[in-house]
Amino acid sequence: MFYFRGCGRWVAVSFTKQQFPLARLSSDSAAPRTPHFDVIVIGGGHAGTEAATAAARCGSRTLLLTHRVDTIGQMSCNPSFGGIGKGHLMREVDALDGLCSRICDQSGVHYKVLNRRKGPAVWGLRAQIDRKLYKQNMQKEILNTPLLTVQEGAVEDLILTEPEPEHTGKCRVSGVVLVDGSTVYAESVILTTGTFLRGMIVIGLETHPAGRLGDQPSIGLAQTLEKLGFVVGRLKTGTPPRIAKESINFSILNKHIPDNPSIPFSFTNETVWIKPEDQLPCYLTHTNPRVDEIVLKNLHLNSHVKETTRGPRYCPSIESKVLRFPNRLHQVWLEPEGMDSDLIYPQGLSMTLPAELQEKMITCIRGLEKAKVIQPDGVLLLLPRMECNGAISAHHNLPLPGYGVQYDYLDPRQITPSLETHLVQRLFFAGQINGTTGYEEAAAQGVIAGINASLRVSRKPPFVVSRTEGYIGVLIDDLTTLGTSEPYRMFTSRVEFRLSLRPDNADSRLTLRGYKDAGCVSQQRYERACWMKSSLEEGISVLKSIEFLSSKWKKLIPEASISTSRSLPVRALDVLKYEEVDMDSLAKAVPEPLKKYTKCRELAERLKIEATYESVLFHQLQEIKGVQQDEALQLPKDLDYLTIRDVSLSHEVREKLHFSRPQTIGAASRIPGVTPAAIINLLRFVKTTQRRQSAMNESSKTDQYLCDADRLQEREL
């Protein structure tokens, strides 16, 4: 057994039993245990919690290592989940029995569906979340998950051993070394380090090492990864100051109320925990030219903006927006942080100016003329000497300005679609370490990494979601084939097959696979998904079988704009496509076969959606089949693109293929710089190789048959 100590050499260590100070044991026994797990997850953020619980659901003995147990479930930035594209990820995480959707249904204070003006394929489920309630509910779930142990500790290094010969990679991870020198061993390790890899907080011209305000960064682990040969990049993000609710003049602002009824994130919930009338509103205001003036006059005091490090394109700081789009008004959403919280989160005002300038800027905005910046609950500051409007203090009533965070990430083209790294076997990455931004993107990667880390332990095939199966598949495929040079955010526009990959049908796409192929889905959820699938198929069949003349339909449903000029019979499924018609009105017109389909609200709504997209879905399914054929053509894992001579590829293409190591022809075709001609040549090579291999296998079978026949003949003689 060996471990890598971040200094470029292999050091032998002995395997010893050791008792660890566990935050929670997965059994009643308190006896000392050998520190060996199936899966170790490093980091207790949104990716880490999903990864740890997914691995445990798959049957793996899992250890979650986090700096502080009391920060599990902490929403470090915005108090919201979901949105356009992100809401799809939430539904898919839930379809695989993930946590965040169910926890949001128990913790929200304002639920709304975005993009309602467009079709249901691109609706974005979103919720404002009570930070305190979310953290409580998440910790309760984590600390009561069977097979999952939680331990406080920081990881300094990785324990590495010789690689498995049947897999690519120069070594294999077999555990971790903590900062106190103790070791924990495992069959698979998942890194979900968020912004902690060499994290640096920035306010004005001041910087301080931290992965998040109040938490130390991970330096040793970052150095280890770099020395192992991983390509490391640098990204940045930021968060706005928090404002005292009582100091805001809401009466002059645009008020936005939640939806009624509220749509839950989870397929297992019919409603959310709180009634619409008890939910909190959000408010909208805008910046003005005075804000632009403050930003432009003080750029010399803002090192974060001057950095060449790339920040999030779709959630930029106010300084970046002013520089990129001068002389414009920018939206500022005032979002509640909880039912009992006196804090308001100003979405759109992420900034890193010195503290006194931040307050000056905020009071220039309509409704915020008397706004007071205060510190969020639960923040333990590690910046005793950073001067920001005096001194930053841990006292709640003193101001805490917005700040930026710069951190390391690893080029995601160094991981496979299962999120295992090419360089180190059984090492998985998930979340911001792969260059993404957002809770939802992190959670989606976390659940896939947890599943595959567990499957790797049991030597089962990886669980890969393709671009044709889910937004998760698009997210991971974009990362592993295209890479990213800025924080990656999910949008519906990134998805080719949006009409098939809708929020309403994520369970049909992923729950059945998750149960059969990964074992990460509970029996109860699986049975519910099977019932919904069979009910939809039966309902569509019944709707297709009911036919009347258009004149009769017009009499039965007079509110529908049905043309009576058609002479041919019209199916009930076609009538359901009209905007004015739903399953309730159809059931009133034809109660006998249709009434039972209105008893479940979700079933009735999904039948309406299926009817709406029936014709276009048929054509899209044909396109999906073509893509799936390309994805089915697997490339050899041990193919050396730099040296193979049987295929004509340019040096540039060889380098790109060597770096990204695509697993299929389809993935190779999406790598920038890999030409169509190169794909054709690669396709020919793969098919020729497959034919040769098949011929060799047949020849081997024939030889074996002849040998067996000779032996049989000798016995008879």
From Swiss-Prot:
<dbReference type="InterPro" id="IPR036188">
    <property type="entry name" value="FAD/NAD-bd_sf"/>
</dbReference>
<feature type="binding site">
    <location>
        <position position="218"/>
    </location>
    <ligand>
        <name>FAD</name>
    </ligand>
</feature>
<dbReference type="InterPro" id="IPR047001">
    <property type="entry name" value="MnmG_C_subdom"/>
</dbReference>
<dbReference type="Pfam" id="PF21680">
    <property type="entry name" value="GIDA_C_1st"/>
</dbReference>
<dbReference type="InterPro" id="IPR002218">
    <property type="entry name" value="MnmG-rel"/>
</dbReference>
<feature type="binding site">
    <location>
        <position position="155"/>
    </location>
    <ligand>
        <name>FAD</name>
    </ligand>
</feature>
<keyword id="KW-0122">Cardiomyopathy</keyword>
<dbReference type="GO" id="GO:0003723">
    <property type="term" value="F:RNA binding"/>
</dbReference>
<dbReference type="InterPro" id="IPR049312">
    <property type="entry name" value="GIDA_C_N"/>
</dbReference>
<dbReference type="GO" id="GO:0070899">
    <property type="term" value="P:mitochondrial tRNA wobble uridine modification"/>
</dbReference>
<keyword id="KW-0488">Methylation</keyword>
<keyword id="KW-0819">tRNA processing</keyword>
<dbReference type="InterPro" id="IPR044920">
    <property type="entry name" value="MnmG_C_subdom_sf"/>
</dbReference>
<dbReference type="GO" id="GO:0005829">
    <property type="term" value="C:cytosol"/>
</dbReference>
<protein>
    <recommendedName>
        <fullName>5-taurinomethyluridine-[tRNA] synthase subunit MTO1, mitochondrial</fullName>
    </recommendedName>
</protein>
<dbReference type="Pfam" id="PF01134">
    <property type="entry name" value="GIDA"/>
</dbReference>
<comment type="function">
    <text>Component of the GTPBP3-MTO1 complex that catalyzes the 5-taurinomethyluridine (taum(5)U) modification at the 34th wobble position (U34) of mitochondrial tRNAs (mt-tRNAs), which plays a role in mt-tRNA decoding and mitochondrial translation. Taum(5)U formation on mammalian mt-tRNA requires the presence of both GTPBP3-mediated GTPase activity and MTO1 catalytic activity.</text>
</comment>
<dbReference type="GO" id="GO:1990234">
    <property type="term" value="C:transferase complex"/>
</dbReference>
<feature type="binding site">
    <location>
        <position position="432"/>
    </location>
    <ligand>
        <name>FAD</name>
    </ligand>
</feature>
<keyword id="KW-0809">Transit peptide</keyword>
<keyword id="KW-1274">Primary mitochondrial disease</keyword>
<keyword id="KW-0225">Disease variant</keyword>
<dbReference type="InterPro" id="IPR040131">
    <property type="entry name" value="MnmG_N"/>
</dbReference>
<keyword id="KW-0496">Mitochondrion</keyword>
<dbReference type="GO" id="GO:0160236">
    <property type="term" value="F:tRNA 5-taurinomethyluridine synthase activity"/>
</dbReference>
<feature type="modified residue" description="N6-methyllysine">
    <location>
        <position position="533"/>
    </location>
</feature>
<dbReference type="InterPro" id="IPR026904">
    <property type="entry name" value="MnmG_C"/>
</dbReference>
<feature type="transit peptide" description="Mitochondrion">
    <location>
        <begin position="1"/>
        <end position="25"/>
    </location>
</feature>
<feature type="binding site">
    <location>
        <begin position="43"/>
        <end position="48"/>
    </location>
    <ligand>
        <name>FAD</name>
    </ligand>
</feature>
<keyword id="KW-0285">Flavoprotein</keyword>
<dbReference type="Pfam" id="PF13932">
    <property type="entry name" value="SAM_GIDA_C"/>
</dbReference>
<keyword id="KW-0274">FAD</keyword>
<dbReference type="GO" id="GO:0050660">
    <property type="term" value="F:flavin adenine dinucleotide binding"/>
</dbReference>
<dbReference type="GO" id="GO:0005739">
    <property type="term" value="C:mitochondrion"/>
</dbReference>
<comment type="similarity">
    <text>Belongs to the MnmG family.</text>
</comment>
<dbReference type="GO" id="GO:0030488">
    <property type="term" value="P:tRNA methylation"/>
</dbReference>
<dbReference type="InterPro" id="IPR020595">
    <property type="entry name" value="MnmG-rel_CS"/>
</dbReference>
<comment type="subunit">
    <text>Homodimer; forms a dimer in the presence of potassium. Interacts with GTPBP3; forms the GTPBP3-MTO1 complex composed of homodimers of GTPBP3 and MTO1.</text>
</comment>
